[in-house]
Amino acid sequence: MSNGIVIIGSGFAARQLVKNIRKQDATIPLTLIAADSMDEYNKPDLSHVISQGQRADDLTRQTAGEFAEQFNLHLFPQTWVTDIDAEARVVKSQNNQWQYDKLVLATGASAFVPPVPGRELMLTLNSQQEYRACETQLRDARRVLIVGGGLIGSELAMDFCRAGKAVTLIDNAASILASLMPPEVSSRLQHRLTEMGVYLLLKSQLQGLEKTDSGILATLDHQRSIEVDAVIAATGLRPETALARRAGLTINRGVCVDSYLQTSNDDIYALGDYAEINGQVLPFLQPIQLSAMVLAKNLLGNNTPLKLPTMLVKIKTPELPLHLAGETQRQDLRWQINTERQGMVARGVDDADQLRAFVVSEDRMKEAFGLLKTLPM
Protein backbone atom coordinates (compact mmCIF):
# COMPACT_ATOMS: atom_id res chain seq x y z
CA MET A 1 0.00 0.00 0.00
CA SER A 2 1.92 3.02 -1.24
CA ASN A 3 -0.64 5.57 0.01
CA GLY A 4 -1.59 3.55 3.06
CA ILE A 5 -4.67 3.91 5.23
CA VAL A 6 -6.44 7.21 5.88
CA ILE A 7 -8.70 7.42 8.95
CA ILE A 8 -11.15 10.30 9.37
CA GLY A 9 -11.72 10.74 13.11
CA SER A 10 -9.60 10.55 16.25
CA GLY A 11 -11.94 9.28 18.96
CA PHE A 12 -12.05 5.94 20.76
CA ALA A 13 -12.84 3.93 17.61
CA ALA A 14 -10.03 5.49 15.56
CA ARG A 15 -7.48 5.05 18.34
CA GLN A 16 -8.42 1.43 18.92
CA LEU A 17 -8.01 0.80 15.20
CA VAL A 18 -4.56 2.45 15.14
CA LYS A 19 -3.37 0.35 18.08
CA ASN A 20 -4.61 -2.87 16.47
CA ILE A 21 -3.03 -2.05 13.10
CA ARG A 22 0.31 -1.22 14.70
CA LYS A 23 0.34 -4.55 16.58
CA GLN A 24 0.41 -6.24 13.18
CA ASP A 25 2.25 -3.76 10.94
CA ALA A 26 4.69 -1.16 12.25
CA THR A 27 5.37 0.60 8.95
CA ILE A 28 2.22 0.87 6.82
CA PRO A 29 1.47 4.61 6.32
CA LEU A 30 -1.33 5.76 8.64
CA THR A 31 -2.88 9.21 8.30
CA LEU A 32 -5.52 10.57 10.70
CA ILE A 33 -7.61 13.65 9.94
CA ALA A 34 -10.00 15.15 12.50
CA ALA A 35 -11.82 18.39 13.24
CA ASP A 36 -10.74 18.42 16.91
CA SER A 37 -7.38 18.67 18.71
CA MET A 38 -6.86 14.88 18.52
CA ASP A 39 -5.89 14.75 22.21
CA GLU A 40 -7.03 11.53 23.89
CA TYR A 41 -9.63 11.55 26.67
CA ASN A 42 -12.07 9.00 28.09
CA LYS A 43 -15.50 9.98 26.77
CA PRO A 44 -17.55 8.20 29.51
CA ASP A 45 -15.86 10.52 32.04
CA LEU A 46 -18.03 13.36 30.67
CA SER A 47 -20.96 11.93 32.65
CA HIS A 48 -19.11 12.63 35.91
CA VAL A 49 -17.08 15.81 35.38
CA ILE A 50 -19.31 18.13 37.41
CA SER A 51 -19.42 16.12 40.64
CA GLN A 52 -15.68 15.38 40.27
CA GLY A 53 -14.90 19.07 39.81
CA GLN A 54 -12.93 18.35 36.64
CA ARG A 55 -12.11 20.89 33.97
CA ALA A 56 -12.00 19.91 30.31
CA ASP A 57 -8.20 19.98 30.24
CA ASP A 58 -8.08 17.58 33.21
CA LEU A 59 -9.57 14.87 30.98
CA THR A 60 -6.62 14.76 28.56
CA ARG A 61 -4.73 11.46 28.81
CA GLN A 62 -2.36 11.81 25.86
CA THR A 63 -1.66 14.72 23.53
CA ALA A 64 -1.92 14.36 19.77
CA GLY A 65 1.85 14.76 19.43
CA GLU A 66 2.53 11.94 21.88
CA PHE A 67 0.02 9.73 20.06
CA ALA A 68 1.67 10.42 16.68
CA GLU A 69 5.14 9.67 18.02
CA GLN A 70 4.09 6.47 19.79
CA PHE A 71 2.34 4.95 16.77
CA ASN A 72 4.23 6.53 13.84
CA LEU A 73 1.29 8.53 12.46
CA HIS A 74 0.67 11.50 10.20
CA LEU A 75 -1.87 13.64 12.07
CA PHE A 76 -3.95 16.54 10.75
CA PRO A 77 -5.88 18.03 13.71
CA GLN A 78 -8.38 20.91 13.47
CA THR A 79 -9.04 19.87 9.87
CA TRP A 80 -12.50 19.58 8.32
CA VAL A 81 -12.84 17.05 5.53
CA THR A 82 -15.02 18.62 2.84
CA ASP A 83 -15.26 15.86 0.25
CA ILE A 84 -14.39 12.26 -0.62
CA ASP A 85 -13.74 11.37 -4.25
CA ALA A 86 -14.33 7.64 -4.01
CA GLU A 87 -13.46 6.98 -7.65
CA ALA A 88 -10.07 8.72 -7.43
CA ARG A 89 -9.59 7.55 -3.81
CA VAL A 90 -8.91 11.07 -2.56
CA VAL A 91 -9.97 12.81 0.66
CA LYS A 92 -10.18 16.61 0.45
CA SER A 93 -10.16 19.50 2.92
CA GLN A 94 -10.24 23.19 2.08
CA ASN A 95 -6.44 23.40 1.87
CA ASN A 96 -5.22 19.86 1.38
CA GLN A 97 -5.91 16.45 -0.11
CA TRP A 98 -4.80 12.92 0.68
CA GLN A 99 -4.63 9.87 -1.57
CA TYR A 100 -5.57 6.58 0.10
CA ASP A 101 -5.50 2.87 -0.58
CA LYS A 102 -8.06 2.20 2.15
CA LEU A 103 -10.25 4.78 3.90
CA VAL A 104 -11.91 4.43 7.32
CA LEU A 105 -14.74 6.70 8.46
CA ALA A 106 -14.71 6.95 12.26
CA THR A 107 -16.11 10.41 12.94
CA GLY A 108 -18.59 9.28 15.58
CA ALA A 109 -21.99 10.85 16.06
CA SER A 110 -23.22 14.27 17.15
CA ALA A 111 -25.62 15.03 19.97
CA PHE A 112 -29.15 15.56 18.67
CA VAL A 113 -30.61 18.91 19.73
CA PRO A 114 -34.44 19.01 19.67
CA PRO A 115 -35.72 21.49 17.04
CA VAL A 116 -37.55 23.86 19.38
CA PRO A 117 -37.46 27.67 19.46
CA GLY A 118 -34.36 28.73 21.39
CA ARG A 119 -32.54 25.47 20.68
CA GLU A 120 -29.27 27.44 20.42
CA LEU A 121 -29.44 27.87 24.21
CA MET A 122 -29.06 24.12 24.73
CA LEU A 123 -25.66 22.71 25.64
CA THR A 124 -24.32 19.29 24.67
CA LEU A 125 -21.71 17.14 26.44
CA ASN A 126 -20.69 14.73 23.70
CA SER A 127 -16.99 15.63 23.56
CA GLN A 128 -14.16 17.24 25.49
CA GLN A 129 -14.38 20.17 23.07
CA GLU A 130 -18.10 20.67 23.81
CA TYR A 131 -17.47 20.52 27.56
CA ARG A 132 -14.63 23.03 27.26
CA ALA A 133 -17.00 25.47 25.54
CA CYS A 134 -19.55 25.40 28.38
CA GLU A 135 -17.70 24.32 31.53
CA THR A 136 -17.87 27.73 33.20
CA GLN A 137 -21.62 28.02 32.62
CA LEU A 138 -22.21 24.50 33.95
CA ARG A 139 -19.97 24.99 36.97
CA ASP A 140 -21.74 28.23 37.90
CA ALA A 141 -25.29 27.00 37.17
CA ARG A 142 -27.45 26.37 40.24
CA ARG A 143 -30.52 25.13 38.31
CA VAL A 144 -30.07 22.66 35.47
CA LEU A 145 -32.61 21.22 33.03
CA ILE A 146 -31.69 17.95 31.32
CA VAL A 147 -33.70 17.15 28.20
CA GLY A 148 -33.86 13.38 27.76
CA GLY A 149 -34.17 10.56 30.28
CA GLY A 150 -32.13 7.88 28.52
CA LEU A 151 -28.76 6.47 29.52
CA ILE A 152 -26.76 9.70 29.26
CA GLY A 153 -29.57 11.88 30.64
CA SER A 154 -29.92 9.66 33.71
CA GLU A 155 -26.15 9.63 34.30
CA LEU A 156 -25.95 13.42 33.99
CA ALA A 157 -28.98 13.99 36.23
CA MET A 158 -27.36 12.00 39.03
CA ASP A 159 -23.99 13.70 38.54
CA PHE A 160 -25.36 17.24 38.65
CA CYS A 161 -27.47 16.34 41.66
CA ARG A 162 -24.41 14.94 43.47
CA ALA A 163 -22.69 18.26 42.75
CA GLY A 164 -25.42 20.04 44.73
CA LYS A 165 -27.37 21.50 41.83
CA ALA A 166 -31.16 21.65 41.48
CA VAL A 167 -31.83 19.23 38.63
CA THR A 168 -34.95 18.83 36.51
CA LEU A 169 -35.11 16.02 33.95
CA ILE A 170 -37.76 16.12 31.22
CA ASP A 171 -38.74 13.30 28.87
CA ASN A 172 -41.85 12.56 26.84
CA ALA A 173 -41.74 8.88 27.89
CA ALA A 174 -43.57 7.64 30.99
CA SER A 175 -40.35 6.38 32.63
CA ILE A 176 -36.61 6.89 32.43
CA LEU A 177 -34.49 4.57 30.24
CA ALA A 178 -37.67 3.87 28.25
CA SER A 179 -35.82 2.80 25.09
CA LEU A 180 -33.72 0.31 27.07
CA MET A 181 -36.10 -1.38 29.50
CA PRO A 182 -39.70 -1.41 30.77
CA PRO A 183 -40.80 0.89 33.62
CA GLU A 184 -41.06 -1.90 36.19
CA VAL A 185 -37.32 -2.52 35.73
CA SER A 186 -36.12 1.10 35.60
CA SER A 187 -38.31 2.13 38.57
CA ARG A 188 -35.55 1.37 41.11
CA LEU A 189 -33.20 3.92 39.54
CA GLN A 190 -36.08 6.32 38.92
CA HIS A 191 -37.01 6.19 42.62
CA ARG A 192 -33.38 6.74 43.64
CA LEU A 193 -33.07 9.83 41.44
CA THR A 194 -36.26 11.23 42.98
CA GLU A 195 -34.94 10.49 46.49
CA MET A 196 -31.75 12.39 45.67
CA GLY A 197 -33.82 15.43 44.67
CA VAL A 198 -34.01 15.16 40.87
CA TYR A 199 -37.35 16.58 39.73
CA LEU A 200 -38.69 14.27 37.03
CA LEU A 201 -41.05 15.69 34.42
CA LEU A 202 -42.11 12.54 32.56
CA LYS A 203 -44.75 12.40 29.83
CA SER A 204 -43.76 16.03 29.26
CA GLN A 205 -42.59 17.99 26.24
CA LEU A 206 -40.17 20.90 25.98
CA GLN A 207 -41.70 23.51 23.68
CA GLY A 208 -39.17 26.32 23.70
CA LEU A 209 -36.39 28.22 25.45
CA GLU A 210 -35.96 31.95 25.98
CA LYS A 211 -33.16 33.96 27.59
CA THR A 212 -34.24 36.10 30.54
CA ASP A 213 -32.45 38.52 32.88
CA SER A 214 -32.20 35.81 35.53
CA GLY A 215 -31.60 32.69 33.44
CA ILE A 216 -33.37 30.64 30.78
CA LEU A 217 -37.14 30.22 30.68
CA ALA A 218 -38.15 26.75 29.48
CA THR A 219 -41.72 26.54 28.22
CA LEU A 220 -43.33 23.10 28.57
CA ASP A 221 -46.59 21.58 27.42
CA HIS A 222 -49.80 22.02 29.45
CA GLN A 223 -48.98 25.73 29.93
CA ARG A 224 -46.13 25.03 32.33
CA SER A 225 -42.73 26.72 32.53
CA ILE A 226 -39.55 26.49 34.57
CA GLU A 227 -36.59 28.86 34.91
CA VAL A 228 -33.08 27.41 34.96
CA ASP A 229 -29.47 28.50 34.46
CA ALA A 230 -28.43 25.83 31.95
CA VAL A 231 -30.17 23.37 29.61
CA ILE A 232 -28.45 20.19 28.41
CA ALA A 233 -29.66 18.13 25.46
CA ALA A 234 -29.33 14.39 26.14
CA THR A 235 -31.73 13.13 23.48
CA GLY A 236 -29.47 10.72 21.65
CA LEU A 237 -26.81 10.79 18.95
CA ARG A 238 -26.99 11.13 15.18
CA PRO A 239 -24.10 10.26 12.81
CA GLU A 240 -23.18 13.13 10.48
CA THR A 241 -23.62 11.27 7.20
CA ALA A 242 -23.39 14.12 4.65
CA LEU A 243 -19.78 13.28 3.77
CA ALA A 244 -20.59 9.60 3.25
CA ARG A 245 -23.55 10.54 1.05
CA ARG A 246 -21.31 12.66 -1.15
CA ALA A 247 -19.02 9.64 -1.49
CA GLY A 248 -22.02 7.65 -2.76
CA LEU A 249 -22.15 5.27 0.22
CA THR A 250 -25.30 3.49 1.38
CA ILE A 251 -26.79 5.24 4.43
CA ASN A 252 -29.53 4.24 6.85
CA ARG A 253 -29.29 5.18 10.55
CA GLY A 254 -25.51 5.18 10.06
CA VAL A 255 -23.16 4.28 7.23
CA CYS A 256 -24.15 0.72 6.30
CA VAL A 257 -21.37 -1.86 6.64
CA ASP A 258 -21.23 -5.64 6.46
CA SER A 259 -19.56 -8.12 8.83
CA TYR A 260 -16.17 -7.00 7.49
CA LEU A 261 -16.93 -3.34 8.35
CA GLN A 262 -16.90 -2.62 4.61
CA THR A 263 -19.26 -0.03 3.13
CA SER A 264 -20.90 -0.20 -0.28
CA ASN A 265 -17.51 0.92 -1.67
CA ASP A 266 -14.82 -1.80 -1.52
CA ASP A 267 -12.08 0.59 -0.36
CA ILE A 268 -14.07 2.47 2.30
CA TYR A 269 -14.85 1.14 5.78
CA ALA A 270 -16.73 2.59 8.76
CA LEU A 271 -16.29 2.08 12.49
CA GLY A 272 -17.80 3.10 15.82
CA ASP A 273 -20.89 5.28 16.31
CA TYR A 274 -20.71 6.18 12.61
CA ALA A 275 -21.32 2.61 11.42
CA GLU A 276 -24.50 0.58 11.12
CA ILE A 277 -23.32 -3.04 11.23
CA ASN A 278 -25.73 -5.39 9.47
CA GLY A 279 -28.63 -3.15 10.52
CA GLN A 280 -27.42 -2.50 14.08
CA VAL A 281 -26.03 0.70 15.58
CA LEU A 282 -23.94 -0.20 18.64
CA PRO A 283 -22.62 2.97 20.32
CA PHE A 284 -20.90 1.17 23.21
CA LEU A 285 -17.22 0.58 23.99
CA GLN A 286 -17.05 -3.22 23.80
CA PRO A 287 -18.49 -3.64 20.28
CA ILE A 288 -16.24 -0.81 19.10
CA GLN A 289 -13.17 -2.54 20.56
CA LEU A 290 -14.08 -5.84 18.91
CA SER A 291 -14.88 -4.12 15.61
CA ALA A 292 -11.51 -2.34 15.64
CA MET A 293 -9.68 -5.65 16.14
CA VAL A 294 -11.46 -7.22 13.17
CA LEU A 295 -11.14 -4.17 10.92
CA ALA A 296 -7.37 -3.98 11.51
CA LYS A 297 -7.05 -7.54 10.20
CA ASN A 298 -9.27 -6.81 7.20
CA LEU A 299 -7.37 -3.66 6.22
CA LEU A 300 -4.14 -5.67 6.24
CA GLY A 301 -5.58 -8.40 4.04
CA ASN A 302 -6.49 -11.01 6.66
CA ASN A 303 -10.23 -11.07 5.98
CA THR A 304 -12.11 -11.85 9.18
CA PRO A 305 -15.86 -11.40 9.79
CA LEU A 306 -17.04 -9.66 12.94
CA LYS A 307 -18.82 -11.96 15.37
CA LEU A 308 -20.18 -10.09 18.36
CA PRO A 309 -21.00 -11.99 21.55
CA THR A 310 -23.86 -10.99 23.84
CA MET A 311 -22.48 -7.98 25.68
CA LEU A 312 -23.10 -6.04 28.88
CA VAL A 313 -24.19 -2.41 28.80
CA LYS A 314 -23.22 -0.44 31.90
CA ILE A 315 -25.20 2.51 33.21
CA LYS A 316 -22.80 4.55 35.31
CA THR A 317 -25.08 6.05 37.95
CA PRO A 318 -22.84 5.65 41.04
CA GLU A 319 -25.63 5.81 43.64
CA LEU A 320 -27.43 2.96 41.85
CA PRO A 321 -25.40 1.46 38.97
CA LEU A 322 -26.96 -0.98 36.49
CA HIS A 323 -25.73 -3.64 34.08
CA LEU A 324 -28.00 -4.98 31.35
CA ALA A 325 -27.76 -7.45 28.49
CA GLY A 326 -29.92 -9.13 25.89
CA GLU A 327 -33.13 -7.90 24.29
CA THR A 328 -34.18 -5.69 27.20
CA GLN A 329 -36.40 -3.53 24.98
CA ARG A 330 -38.54 -6.44 23.71
CA GLN A 331 -42.23 -5.81 24.38
CA ASP A 332 -43.26 -9.48 24.68
CA LEU A 333 -41.02 -10.51 27.59
CA ARG A 334 -42.29 -11.34 31.08
CA TRP A 335 -40.11 -9.79 33.74
CA GLN A 336 -39.29 -11.68 36.92
CA ILE A 337 -37.94 -9.09 39.33
CA ASN A 338 -36.16 -9.97 42.56
CA THR A 339 -35.46 -6.93 44.69
CA GLU A 340 -33.42 -6.87 47.88
CA ARG A 341 -31.80 -4.11 49.88
CA GLN A 342 -28.43 -4.81 48.26
CA GLY A 343 -29.75 -4.75 44.70
CA MET A 344 -32.07 -6.05 42.00
CA VAL A 345 -32.04 -8.91 39.51
CA ALA A 346 -34.64 -8.60 36.73
CA ARG A 347 -34.95 -11.47 34.28
CA GLY A 348 -36.85 -11.08 31.01
CA VAL A 349 -38.18 -14.43 29.74
CA ASP A 350 -40.13 -15.38 26.61
CA ASP A 351 -43.21 -17.61 26.24
CA ALA A 352 -40.99 -20.70 26.47
CA ASP A 353 -39.47 -19.44 29.75
CA GLN A 354 -36.14 -18.89 27.98
CA LEU A 355 -34.05 -16.05 29.43
CA ARG A 356 -33.77 -13.33 26.79
CA ALA A 357 -32.61 -10.33 28.81
CA PHE A 358 -31.62 -9.22 32.27
CA VAL A 359 -30.90 -6.11 34.32
CA VAL A 360 -28.91 -6.21 37.57
CA SER A 361 -28.09 -3.40 39.99
CA GLU A 362 -25.71 -2.49 42.81
CA ASP A 363 -24.16 -5.43 44.70
CA ARG A 364 -26.05 -7.91 42.55
CA MET A 365 -24.15 -6.80 39.45
CA LYS A 366 -21.68 -9.59 40.27
CA GLU A 367 -24.36 -12.01 39.03
CA ALA A 368 -24.22 -10.48 35.54
CA PHE A 369 -21.54 -12.76 34.07
CA GLY A 370 -23.35 -15.92 35.17
CA LEU A 371 -26.58 -14.65 33.61
CA LEU A 372 -24.71 -13.60 30.47
CA LYS A 373 -23.64 -17.21 29.88
CA THR A 374 -27.27 -18.38 29.90
CA LEU A 375 -28.46 -15.91 27.24
CA PRO A 376 -28.80 -17.34 23.71
CA MET A 377 -26.00 -16.30 21.35
Curated annotation (Swiss-Prot):
SUPFAM superfamilies, A to Z: FAD/NAD(P)-binding domain (SSF51905)
Keyword Electron transport: no
Matching NCBIfam families: PRK04965.1
EC number: 1.18.1.-
Disulfide bonds: none
Top-tier EC class: oxidoreductase
Record has Oxidoreductase as a keyword: yes
Catalytic reaction annotation: 2 reduced [nitric oxide reductase rubredoxin domain] + NAD(+) + H(+) = 2 oxidized [nitric oxide reductase rubredoxin domain] + NADH
Pathway note: Nitrogen metabolism; nitric oxide reduction
GO molecular function: oxidoreductase activity, acting on iron-sulfur proteins as donors, NAD or NADP as acceptor
Signal peptide start-end: none
Keywords, in A-Z order: Cytoplasm, FAD, Flavoprotein, NAD, Oxidoreductase
Species per Swiss-Prot/TrEMBL record: Shigella boydii serotype 4 (strain Sb227)
One Gene Ontology CC term in the entry: cytoplasm
Protein name as catalogued: Nitric oxide reductase FlRd-NAD(+) reductase
